[in-house]
């Protein structure tokens, strides 16, 4: 029994049946690309990585032939559209067919494609399209990428020369400028030239103009030292550099005796003296002189919107970092930092640092990671890990005028205790009772 090669369900030997029409796979052609059915089937076999061996006399029923014809039409339209879009994209990146922004002064010149170049043999166009259709997809993609990279590597010797359209094949020309696959006329494309308002140079596209502006006219002004001629990237770094001409280093503050481990930390500290307050909160509008102060301030807004609450003691925190520090108090195997003068120990180094201020003038002290066994016994008896942070900061709020406005956490001076208390509460998440 002679059945359809593709579906195997239709009997093609019955000449009296309504489905007696038969299509030879080696000779019948699909209407869109005018390629044989065998070539379409070979392409489908390549998609599933299968070798197709068509026997002479293999035929298709009308239904299967129509399905393959529909598939062929879709593929031809797809390749036509893909060619048009990829060519237009490459043109947009290489000054072809750029559309200017509104309000810009441009020079417009219309591109006209001779009709004689468009009206060519339809079979030649179909051949070119179907060659793309039967190519392996990965090979096709690689070819497109290679073509694009090669064009990107070509240097434009004279940007002011008139743009010359590259040679394209007939299929591309019709897809871009002539008639579409359905016979409708497409609007004529226009190329544009744009002029730099700063130097007057003319470019073929808005893309090239923006590249020119970013490279030639958007450079940050150099800040040059009037003494030695060294260049710094901004005014602040130049101010820090002036330390070298005053007998200091870039790790020392110009306005106070403080010194830091890195120049960037020195610069952050000096912003406190400048008090420019160039960092602004986007939610409430408050301005700060240092970026870390703005960061701590943002944590306050985050705590108001979504506070982090300890499930053990029900205390709320502004950030995950401070919450993680707090959870150490509830752990039995938490890390300890022991005072070298008294038996107290702390989970945080900065609380130990503040605690050590209570021993100033008594002895020369240090920091120990471990305590002797006899001192650990005293620690357990004193229960020093209860509310240790509050006990540690009491030295800051004492009546000592020397330390009354000095933050031991970030080494910042304040005019009075009230400002210091506000700073500790909102910038370092210290609970003051």
Swiss-Prot record:
GO terms for biological process: anterior/posterior axis specification, embryo; bicoid mRNA localization; oogenesis; positive regulation of transcription by RNA polymerase II; regulation of transcription by RNA polymerase II; sexual reproduction. A motif (Nuclear localization signal) lies at residues 187-193. One of its GO terms (molecular function) is RNA polymerase II transcription regulatory region sequence-specific DNA binding. GO terms for cellular component: cytosol; nucleus; polytene chromosome interband. A zinc finger (C2H2-type) spans 194-217, 223-245, 251-273, 279-301, 308-330, 337-359, 405-428. Zn(2+) binds at residues 4, 7, 61, 64. Residues 149-162 have a biased composition (Acidic residues). Residues 1-90 form the ZAD domain. The keyword Transcription regulation applies. Keywords: Activator, Developmental protein, DNA-binding, Metal-binding, Nucleus, Repeat, Transcription, Transcription regulation, Zinc, Zinc-finger. The keyword Metal-binding applies. Predominantly localized to the sub- and supraesophagal ganglia and the ventral nerve cord in the embryo, after dorsal closure. It is found in: Nucleus. Residues 141-162 are annotated as: Disordered. Transcriptional activator that controls bicoid gene expression during oogenesis. Found in transcriptionally active cells. Binds to specific sites on polytene chromosomes of third instar larvae. Binds to the consensus DNA sequence 5'-YTAGAGATGGRAA-3'. Homodimer (via ZAD domain) in solution. Binds DNA as a homodimer. N-terminal regions of the protein are required, in addition to the zinc fingers, for the specificity of chromatin-binding. This is Serendipity locus protein delta.
């Amino acid at each position: 029994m002679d059945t359809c090669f593709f579906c195997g369900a239709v009997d093609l030997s019955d000449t009296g049946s309504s489905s007696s029409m038969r299509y030879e796979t080696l000779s019948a052609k699909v209407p869109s690309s005018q390629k044989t059915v065998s070539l379409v089937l070979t392409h489908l076999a390549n998609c599933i990585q299968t070798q197709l061996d068509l026997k002479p006399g293999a035929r298709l029923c009308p239904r299967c032939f129509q399905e393959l014809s529909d598939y062929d039409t879709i593929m031809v339209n797809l390749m036509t559209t893909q060619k048009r879009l990829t060519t237009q994209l490459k043109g947009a990146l290489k000054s072809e067919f750029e559309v200017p922004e509104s309000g810009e002064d441009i020079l417009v010149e219309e591109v006209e494609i001779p009709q004689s170049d468009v009206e060519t043999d339809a079979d030649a166009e179909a051949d070119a399209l179907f060659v793309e259709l039967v190519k392996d997809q990965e090979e096709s993609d690689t070819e497109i990428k290679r073509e694009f990279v090669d064009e990107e590597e070509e240097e434009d010797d004279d940007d002011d020369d008139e743009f010359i359209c590259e040679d394209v094949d007939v299929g591309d020309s019709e897809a871009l400028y002539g008639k579409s696959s359905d016979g409708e006329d497409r609007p004529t494309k226009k190329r544009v030239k744009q002029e730099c308002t700063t130097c007057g140079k003319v470019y073929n596209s808005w893309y090239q103009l923006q590249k020119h502006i970013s490279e030639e006219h958007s450079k940050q002004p150099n800040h040059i030292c009037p003494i030695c001629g060294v260049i710094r990237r901004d005014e602040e770094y130049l101010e820090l550099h002036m330390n070298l001409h005053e007998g200091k280093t870039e790790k020392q503050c110009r306005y106070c005796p403080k010194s830091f481990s890195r120049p960037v930390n020195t610069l952050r500290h000096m912003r406190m003296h400048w008090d420019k307050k160039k960092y602004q909160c986007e939610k409430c509008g408050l301005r700060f002189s240092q970026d870390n102060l703005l960061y701590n301030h943002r944590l306050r807004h985050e705590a108001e919107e979504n506070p982090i609450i300890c499930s053990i003691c029900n205390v709320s925190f502004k950030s995950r970092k401070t919450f993680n520090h707090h959870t150490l108090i509830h752990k039995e195997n938490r890390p300890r930092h022991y005072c070298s003068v008294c038996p107290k120990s702390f989970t945080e180094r900065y609380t130990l640092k503040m605690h050590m201020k209570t021993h100033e003038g008594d002895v020369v002290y240090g920091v120990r990671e471990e305590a002797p066994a006899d001192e650990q016994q005293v620690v357990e008896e004193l229960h020093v890990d209860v509310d240790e942070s509050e006990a540690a900061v009491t030295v800051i709020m004492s009546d000592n005028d020397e330390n009354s406005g000095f933050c031991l956490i970030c080494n910042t001076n304040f005019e009075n205790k009230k400002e210091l208390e506000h700073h500790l509460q909102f910038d370092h998440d210290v609970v003051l009772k």
